[in-house]
Amino acid sequence: IRMEPKFEAKSYSPDMLLSVDGITPIGGRKYVISKSEEGLVKSKLYFAKTSDLGLKNLKYILESGQKDNTVTWQNQISTIRTIDLLDSTEKISGFSGTWDSGLVEIVLHPFIWNDAFAMQQFLTLLDLEADKYKISGYENGPLFCAAVCNHETLERLAKFNPLRTIHPLGELNIPNMRGSSFFDAPVPPLYKGTPQMRIGVFDGGADSTLPHLKDFVTAHELTPITGHPALIAHGTAVCGAVLYGLLNYKSSTEQLETPIVSVDSYRVLPQQQTGNPIEDSGLYPAIDQIEQIVHNHTETSLYNLSFGPRGAIVDDDISRFTYALDRLSM
């Protein structure tokens, strides 16, 4: 259901149409209406799942005019541009002109997760050995599939109606630290007991033996691979920032105040290399670990995550990384 320009706000959602018997909303995104030298004209579209009965009910309401005297219906219908299916080109994004094959993420609409027939259709179109793809599903949510694909596979999948999007699957990346790497640290705080309020940090590890961290940081190893010095340095800096804030302007003779929180540092990087490109990218295994920790530690209500897939996250583009974090934050 494509909206007219300038009707992107949530308040313009065509709720009356989406509540027609047999029609269920399953998400939304932005779309491009037109391109010109002046720029792109964009608006919002809403995804809906339906059946022949749902379409029949909608057709009857439109043709019979039974809701035409309802002001809300009038206002909502007038903001709709078209009702149609996504074009194949709208489902594939983020690939360079030279891309030939590699790791991709396939996103399918929610209802396919409970539909064995549609799932079999998808796997037939995917046509890959079991070690070449990994599927992660969420109750009442999208299905995400990391896979090793080529152009031919993408072209087959693009014609599959339940497909929402396909984009490259980025590898895990921790950004370089900004500012000076070395300066004389202030005097460690007085120990007055471990604060009960705990904050979780997912990163490349932390040196919990440092005087500033040893009483306030608990290190948890979630990967069997030896920590990388640069990743540990990054995680150590993050833990320091959580406990003390910005230290750059503190003098070396100034004693720090005792932190009011303590930190659980979860080292999820580097991930173990197995020879399987999906596992070796590190992204899906890291998401699995983050979800498990957050679900198992309900006593912790705040977490910090300092890494993500390499490259920009396209605005309004759904991925398992962004979806999982949004879901965990609820």
Question: Which role fits each region the language model picked out?
Answer:
Residues K91, C149-E152, F182-P188, G245-K250, ...:
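Short alpha-helical segments and helix-capping/turn motifs at coil-helix boundaries
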Residues F117-A118, P270-M330:
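Substrate-binding/access-modulating region of protease and related hydrolase catalytic domains
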